[in-house]
UniProtKB/Swiss-Prot annotation:
The keyword Cell inner membrane is annotated on this UniProt entry: no
The family this protein is said to belong to: Belongs to the eIF-3 subunit C family.
Role: Component of the eukaryotic translation initiation factor 3 (eIF-3) complex, which is involved in protein synthesis of a specialized repertoire of mRNAs and, together with other initiation factors, stimulates binding of mRNA and methionyl-tRNAi to the 40S ribosome. The eIF-3 complex specifically targets and initiates translation of a subset of mRNAs involved in cell proliferation.
Protein name as it appears in the record: Eukaryotic translation initiation factor 3 subunit C
Gene: nip1
Listed Gly residues bias regions: 820-864
GO CC terms in record: cytoplasmic stress granule; eukaryotic 43S preinitiation complex; eukaryotic 48S preinitiation complex; eukaryotic translation initiation factor 3 complex, eIF3e; eukaryotic translation initiation factor 3 complex, eIF3m; multi-eIF complex
Gene3D superfamilies assigned: Winged helix-like DNA-binding domain superfamily/Winged helix DNA-binding domain
Originating organism: Aspergillus terreus (strain NIH 2624 / FGSC A1156)
Amino acid sequence: MSRFFARGGSDSESSSEDEQELYSDREEEEQFSDSEEESSEAESSEEESSDDEGAGASRFLKNVSESEESEDEERVTVVKSAKDKRLDELEGIIKAIENAEKINDWAVISSEFDKLNRQIVKVTQAGPTPKIYIQTVADLEDFVNETIAKQKSSNKKMNASNAKGFNAVKQRIKKNNKEYATLIEKYRADKDGFMAGGDEEPKPVISAPRISKVERVEAPVAVTATADDDGFATVGRGGKTLQYTPESILKHLRVIVESRGKKNTDRFEQIRTMEKLLEVAQNPYQRIRIYLTLISTRFDLTSSSSANYMSVDQWKLAQQEFSTLLSVLESNREYVVTEGAEEWEDDEKQPQVAAGETLHVPGSIVSYVERLDDELTRSLQQIDPHTAEYIERLSDEKELYTNLVRTQVYAEALTTSEKSDPRQDSLNRVIMRRLEHIYFKPAQVVTILEEGTWKSLPSNLASDITPRANSGEVTSLVQTLCNYLFRHSDGILRARAMLCQIYFLALHDQYYRSRDLMLMSHLTENIANFDVSTQILFNRTLVQIGLCAFRAGLVYEAQNTLSEVCGSGRQKELLAQGIILQRYSTVSPEQERLERQRQLPFHMHINLELLECIYLTSSMFLEVPLMAQTSSSPEMKRRVISKTFRRMLDYNERQVFTGPAENTRDGVIMSAKFLAAGDWKKAAEMLNSIKIWDLMPQPEKIKEMLSQQIQEEGLRTYLFTYAPFYDSVSIATLSNMFELPEKKIQAIISRMISHEELAAALDQVNNAIVFRKGVELSRLQSQIVTLADKSMNLLEANEKTLEQRTQGMANAFQRDQGAGARGGRGAGRGGQARGGPRFPGGQQGRRPGGQQFSGGALGGAIKA
């Protein structure tokens, strides 16, 4: 409720007489109003307004004489009654509740609701219940009901503090509103009419007529929203007049900018102020300055809220304002927003741009679009991906991508060809952002996105880097963006561009090209020197290459590529698709917060179940023949291709009862057991029955490839297992057994013979395989080879230990010279020192290489 203090009247009495009258009036007032609560406040003279008929009119009016004006020229004291102070406190609490509702901060709402109920008790002691309180509790109850409905339709849960506050408010609001049910019904029936009427004020009870020496008549003061003939105007905090004129725009903006980062700053009020300034802005410069400050203020709302991401409504408003800002800049080329420009200091006048000149405005268009991108990513991280809300939020990416392309076109017009130019760096950043939005998408999706983007852009906008005419060629688009970054950037941007291109090629089944680019980039050698986000992108690219190799039927390459990520058991963490919380983890809360910020949105995830299935299937094709080979060749037992697969297979074999396969992992293990037993048909049937293959492109082609691989590996397993029991075997028999062409069988056997995996020869005359006998080691020979291997391992370990202990001691074991000089042991006599025999003359022989430690008697026996 607005309260104004009017100055009125001009008395002809002297100042001394006036003072006496005031003092006498105050004494009489104290005598007649000791029982009243308002008399405790230091009120001005004897006036007491009887009935205020206008609800918005001020209740406290002060007559000031000319003498008082002369005394109060330097200081104006605003006197408020206790009731007005309580109403001010009530309005402050209500405003805090409204702000907390905008950001869904139920912890703040709960605490402020308690304060509100305590304050309303004090307010109602001196008058009726304020209508603003009825409005607040009614709207709060509606907001609680809306939140309950949203929680039922969404799987996303509140955090602990929010849920606690929400439950507390939900329980207390219904009980509280029962006391004001009648007033709340009136408010909901006609909200505007209810709030338009003033609060009914009780008439003050006058105990006795007041006697004063001078009777004063006060005229009612009308409160208006705009300036009138009496000099009244809308006032803000501190009694300052708020005037929004084109000339005062820069002053208002400077006040807003200077208040950034300070506590107790009402950013919503600042946003409303700038929206009003936009209405009175007259030239492009004013609109550009307002939009730059307005967008920054909307971003600041995130830092002051409990949520760590921008609300959807504020994000959309910021995105629309950013798009409007680009339109203003595109229409007025004489104004350029660039980093490092000098700020206009004179707020009294506007800068004038002569014809042909350019005015640089400080700011960063690229930083704004990057922040919009980051806020969208944070929002997608927080939303449950299995709800319609996620899909709806993801649709905002189209508008963001349009602004990215638009920003790129704007940056191209400002960029020079020098790498060191800050404008070139800005262009590189926005191109990198655009590339990161398309590298993981299929070509069909990117084509639709590009076509929609260029249709929504003005026809006069054109890009030299990515022309409008080539928007349909997705492969060419990615290649063009990457090549531009290769030429004009270095460091992290160049590495990320390379990884994005490799990922895109692997996603579209170009295995050999993506593999060659990865090898030529040498990123595998120095990826540890890059930041964590680039390492995550490297892991994603590596996994995509492995998946591409598997789709191409290159099982060995797929297993070898995927082993680094899948063999660690930390796929979620390495691919930034989840956090593995361990019981005794030493990760600090700050590290955990950073780890959560690095998580990728759900639509960018690689299916971990499919990834594990492909890795286990590839390991099965390599491990099962290897296990069959080592059963007859003990010297091969040390070879383990996949420890993960071996561990799962051993665990399954230890089970007393084995039921049917219940998940993808069990299906692969059961298929491996059938393959090891020689039943390749059941193995193929079990493997093809896994439903996850339907998630891959062309699933029938994948299943056909798997069946062929099982036939080939089944043949290899059969030969490794039963070779000791055959003298010869017909190729036609093997062809009928595994349903493979004879030429294919001959090729497989020839490869096994050339790799020395099979001791046999091809008899082309009889079309058969002849096995050689006596090549396999006997049991005793196998034990001797094992003992020799262990001894060599012990020798190598001893030499490494000696190297560590003798670093910087080159002559530590050259005892011949020192011992001879001291006349000690071994000097002048042909004794033997520890570690081996001495040569004639008392000098110990030194063998070339190593640290000259032979391993003692055992080492000598082995080397002999």
